[in-house]
Amino acid sequence: MIIQSVEPLLLSCPLAEPVTFPFFGGCRTIFKRDAMVIRITTNEDLVGYAPGPASEEVATTIIEKITPFLLGEELFNPENFVEDLVDKKGDSIWSAAGAVEVALYDLWGKANKCSVTEFFGGRKQETICCYGSAGMYQSAQAYAEEAAAVCELGFEAYKYRPALGPEDDLKTVELMREAVGPDVGLCLDAHAWWRMGAKSYSSAIVEFLSEAIAMHGITWLEEPLPVKDRDAYAKLKAMHYVNIAAGEHEHDFLGFRTLLGRDCVDIVQADVSHHGGLSGISKIIDLCERRFATFAFHNWGTALAPVVDAWSGSCCPRETARWLEYPQYAHRDTRVMYPFPLSDELVPEAPVPVKGELPL
């Protein structure tokens, strides 16, 4: 069976009307959402698919630097594919190579008439615990109402993006806890706190907020500081106010080793589309197990990405692969965020969470 084509397909989903989100640092307007699907075809009409980073740069990398290694080759076991390419091209190719690897594994599984999970030790979970992710910038009361709406679907936790200013960010947590009760987890994706120019929060403010929100039972505080400031992360984690999460902005495996080796985080986040594919995630999760850290899948794309991440997560015990991010969009429920219909149109038969659990 010969590989005939490798296509990084870039797709765009314009919103019917732009959506504007005012926040402490200014205003964010969303005009469209983009996506990438990688398609690999063989001469026997077998096709492998994978989600990829929605980036023209990554698409160019796949076309120019990865495709020449595949065209005309016999379909092969891709277990060493990413590692071999990194050896040849350097760490900068890790993300793109990993995304292509997923499509190769899809093909390899189909060719061998088995689930991809069989190549990673088999399933240890038949469902993956999801958290509902939405919460683009809005008023404190609107955040609370959205949290309640998302948790009506059975999710054990809700993630949102705080950036209303320190006082209103704290008020938001208080109102959300009142809205969802004591048993639902609250996850704060605080990447905006250090991206607001002169209005960015200082380390002292981040430390104050971490202590202040702790009493409300926060599941984790995600990327509250500039991602490369390892010393600041280690200091904040050592205060033991709340669990600190990060990882989505790491560009190679060394970055994850550094996060854990320098004791920067309690929870490591990554996804197959950006972090070395299925083999990369397997290595990251193994690292988490050895460092006694929790792993949580990060997702912010189409419905295809959580399914592929779930393949990987199902091969690990829940004690390690604890959470799967499941974005909530307004085309499913008008009470949340904004619409992204392309997400579901790509994989209309993809499994969806049932009472917060994604069945496989």
Which residues does each predicted region cover?
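Glycine-rich, aromatic-flanked loop segments that form ligand/cofactor-binding clefts
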Residues: 101-137, 171
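Shared catalytic-loop signature of beta/alpha-barrel
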Residues: 217, 228-245, 250-356
